[in-house]
C-alpha cells in the first residue's frame, strides 16, 4: 500500500512538473517558443507563396537553416525560382561523378550576378608578382602539408556581403605568421584594411590585393586587432591608431606570376601564403573534393577572389592545394576547399604573396 501511495505521489509530481514545463513553453517570452513560432511563420509564408511541393518544403528548410527573411510574396517567389535553378545545377553536376561535389548553402537563393556583386572583388592587376622574390632551395618538400596541424592557422571568418576577401586573406597570412613567430594566436582587423588601405590601390568592399595590403601595413606602421577595430562589412572612415598597432610588417615576399613550384616551396617550408584566383559560377556551391574548372582564367586581370593557401596533398590521384576561404565555416569543407594543383588552376599562383612580421 505504501509503495502504491509513493507511486501515485510520484505520478502527481511528474504531471505537475510537466504541466509547469508546458505552461513555461507556452509563455510568449520563452525563446524556444519564439524560435518555433518563427520557423512556422516562415514556412507558412513560403508555402502560401509557392505551394506545397517537395521543392517548396526543401526551400522552406533552406530558408530557416540560413536565417533568410523575405519582404513579400513576390520576393519569396523570386528566391524560390533562383533556388530551384541552383538546385537543378547542383544535382546535374553531382550526377557527372567529377572530382568535386556541390551542395546547397547560404548562397543558393542568389543569382550569379548578385553573388558576384556582394562576395567578389573587382579584378586587380597584380603586377607586383611578375617578378617574384621568393628564393627556391634544394630542400626536399614533404608529400603533403597542412599548417592547421601546427596550430598557426586562425579560425575561418566570414566577409559577409562585402568584397573584402583580400583583407581576410591578408589577415589570415598575418595571423599565421604571428602565431609562428610568437607562439600565440591573434585575430587582426580586416576593417582597418577596408577603411584605411585605399592609397595602396585597394578599394575596400570593391576589392584589393594582399600584396598591396602588406605594403600598406609596412608603411603605415602596423595593423590593429579585430577587438580594437571590429569588422562591420561596410566601407567607413579610417580609425587607425598607431598606439594600438598589434603587428608590423617588415617586408612581403611575392611568388613569381604562375610559378606553382615557388608557391609549393613557400607553403611547404615557410608558412601559409595569400593567393587569389578567378571564381566562376558553380564554385560558390562547392561542397567537397578537388575543385577544377575549364572556364576560369589565370591572367592577372582574371582573378577576383583572394584566399589563403594553408597546405597541399593528393586526393584520388589528383594533386591539390588546401585553401582557407572567408565565406564562413558552414561553406565548403568547414570553410576550406581543395583546388587542383599543377595547372595554375584559375590563377591560384598568379597573385601569391606572404608577409614577414615583427
From Swiss-Prot:
Residue pairs linked by disulfide bridges in the UniProt entry: 162-205, 196-238, 296-346
Signal peptide: 1-21
SUPFAM superfamilies in the record: Cysteine proteinases (SSF54001)
Keywords, sorted A to Z: Disulfide bond, Glycoprotein, Lyase, Signal
Pathway given in the UniProt record: Aromatic compound metabolism; phenylpropanoid biosynthesis
GO molecular-function terms, A-Z: cysteine-type peptidase activity; feruloyl-CoA hydratase/lyase activity
Reaction catalysis annotation: (E)-ferulate + H2O = vanillin + acetate; 4-O-beta-D-glucosyl-trans-ferulate + H2O = 4-O-beta-D-glucosyl-vanillin + acetate
InterPro entries per record: Papain-like_cys_pep_sf, Pept_asp_AS, Pept_cys_AS, Pept_his_AS, Peptidase_C1A, Peptidase_C1A_C, Peptidase_C1A_papain-like, Prot_inhib_I29
EC number annotated for this UniProt entry: 4.1.2.-
Prodomain residues: 22-140
GO biological process: phenylpropanoid biosynthetic process; proteolysis
PROSITE patterns: PROKAR_LIPOPROTEIN, THIOL_PROTEASE_ASN, THIOL_PROTEASE_CYS, THIOL_PROTEASE_HIS
Residues that carry a glycan: 125, 254
Claim: rRNA-binding is one of the keywords in the record: no
UniProt-annotated catalytic positions: 165, 305, 325
Family: Belongs to the peptidase C1 family.
Function: Involved in the biosynthesis of vanillin and derivative natural products. Catalyzes the double carbon bond cleavage of ferulic acid to vanillin and of respective glucosides.
The protein's name: Vanillin synthase
Amino acid at each position: 500500500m505504501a509503495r502504491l501511495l509513493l507511486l501515485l505521489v510520484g505520478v502527481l509530481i511528474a504531471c505537475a512538473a510537466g504541466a509547469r514545463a508546458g505552461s513555461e513553453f507556452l509563455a510568449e517570452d520563452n525563446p524556444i517558443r519564439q524560435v518555433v513560432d518563427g520557423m512556422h511563420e516562415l514556412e507558412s509564408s513560403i508555402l502560401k507563396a509557392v505551394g506545397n511541393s517537395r521543392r517548396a518544403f526543401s526551400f522552406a528548410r533552406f530558408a530557416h537553416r540560413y536565417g533568410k527573411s523575405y519582404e513579400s510574396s513576390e520576393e519569396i517567389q523570386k528566391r524560390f525560382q533562383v533556388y530551384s535553378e541552383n538546385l537543378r545545377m547542383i544535382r546535374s553536376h553531382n550526377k557527372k561523378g567529377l572530382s568535386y561535389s556541390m551542395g546547397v548553402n547560404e548562397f543558393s537563393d542568389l543569382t550569379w550576378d548578385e553573388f558576384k556583386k556582394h562576395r567578389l572583388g573587382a579584378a586587380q592587376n597584380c603586377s607586383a608578382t611578375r617578378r617574384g622574390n621568393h628564393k627556391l632551395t634544394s630542400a626536399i618538400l614533404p608529400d603533403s602539408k597542412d599548417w592547421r596541424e601546427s596550430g598557426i592557422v586562425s579560425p575561418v571568418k566570414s566577409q559577409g556581403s562585402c568584397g573584402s576577401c583580400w583583407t581576410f586573406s591578408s589577415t589570415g597570412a598575418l595571423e599565421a605568421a604571428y602565431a609562428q613567430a610568437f607562439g600565440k594566436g591573434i585575430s587582426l582587423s580586416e576593417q582597418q584594411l577596408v577603411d584605411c588601405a585605399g592609397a595602396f590601390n585597394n578599394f575596400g568592399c570593391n576589392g584589393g590585393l594582399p600584396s598591396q595590403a602588406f605594403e600598406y601595413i609596412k608603411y603605415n606602421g602596423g595593423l590593429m586587432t579585430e577587438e580594437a577595430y571590429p569588422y562591420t562589412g561596410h566601407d567607413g572612415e579610417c580609425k587607425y591608431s598607431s598606439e594600438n598597432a598589434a603587428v608590423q610588417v617588415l617586408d612581403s615576399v611575392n611568388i613569381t606570376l604562375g610559378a606553382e613550384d615557388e608557391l609549393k616551396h613557400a607553403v611547404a617550408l615557410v608558412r601559409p601564403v595569400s593567393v587569389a584566383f578567378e571564381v566562376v559560377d558553380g564554385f560558390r556551391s562547392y561542397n567537397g573534393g578537388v575543385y577544377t574548372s575549364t572556364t576560369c582564367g589565370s591572367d592577372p586581370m582574371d582573378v577576383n577572389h583572394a584566399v589563403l593557401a594553408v597546405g597541399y596533398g593528393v586526393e584520388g590521384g589528383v594533386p591539390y592545394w588546401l585553401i582557407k576561404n572567408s565565406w564562413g565555416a558552414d561553406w565548403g569543407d568547414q570553410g576550406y576547399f581543395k583546388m587542383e594543383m599543377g595547372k595554375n588552376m584559375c590563377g591560384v599562383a598568379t597573385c601569391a604573396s606572404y608577409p614577414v612580421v615583427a
